[in-house]
Each structure stands twice: as structure tokens, then as C-alpha cells.
Amino acid sequence: MKSLNRNVKEVSFNVVDQKWIIRVVDSHDPHMVVDGAVCRGCTWVGQSEIYMSNELTERTFKRVLLHELVHAWLFATQMSVPDAFNEEQLCDFFAIYSEKILDLANKIEQRFFSNEDNSSI
């Protein structure tokens, strides 16, 4: 199992033509605490930022990253209204964006777990 490249602190990327930044931070960073609970990942849609804990294994990192990227995509596509989001919309969202989200997650994971220092995708 690979470990995080400590030289890479953040990676920038685009979601539907919106610039986003993902940062790996200490698990007790203020951005990682929501309603008093420490999170493994957190998406701040107003700032177009995703924060990930530096204590995650590669496998857990990928799962949490995918979860947070879905939040970003929902916000960027304006589909993030929970009361109005039904099963058909969920299936459409998955059909339209799942390959793009997975492809981006793979690229981000490679940046954080390789020896490359490039911080942009």
C-alpha cells in the first residue's frame, strides 16, 4: 500500500468549468470539523475546496475522495437540492457524470500518492 506524498499539499482541478482545490490537512484542522465531529473529508462548496485527512490509507482516501467529488459535482451542476432530488435524477446524474468523477479521482489519487510534485490536473 502506498503512502501519501508529503510534498504534495494541494491539487487544483476543474469541475464543470469551475476551479476547485483539494487539500490534504491534519485531521483536526478546523476545516475538517463539522458540527463538532471530525470528518475524514469535507467539501466547502462556497469556497470550491475539498479537505482530506492526512491520516487516510490509500484505499480509504479513494473512497472518501469519490464521496467528496460527488458533493462538488452536485454543487457545480446545481443538483444539490436534497428535497427535490429523486431516484431518477440520481440515476441520470450517475449516468452522466460517474465516468468523469472516477477519472478525476484516479488522477487526483495519483498526484497525492506518487512522487510527482505537480499540483494541477
PLM regions: where:
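Metalloprotease/metallohydrolase-associated module, dominated by Zn2+-dependent proteases
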Residues: 1-59, 76-121
